[in-house]
Amino acid sequence: MEMTSKERILAAMNLQRPDRVPLMCQFSIGCMMEQLHPDPVAFWYDQQTFADGLIELRERFRFDGILVSLHGHSDDWKRDLLSREELGEGSVRLEYPDRTELHCWQDLPVVTFRSPR
């Protein structure tokens, strides 16, 4: 009988024999963005957007699980936001009083501070 992903992982972790070897993956942020094409700012800061993306990739590639890299999640990221500029497909510039952030599908955000930290 075929196991569910959860049963398969639990069996392997308990040193029991699963129906097959559990398959897991850890995507880079750039790879996830290129696959999903989300709003790059929401993907970086919004927990639900990030979680939905992980679930979609797990289902798309039929993995038993995904190893999660936690990153910029912040509930108050909009608090000091001065402006948001769309620079092209999948590319956004955020302006804050102390810094500029460039978000894109290809890589992690690039942050430039206005004064030395």
Regions found by a protein language model. Name each.
Residues 1-117:
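Catalytic cores of TIM-barrel enzymes
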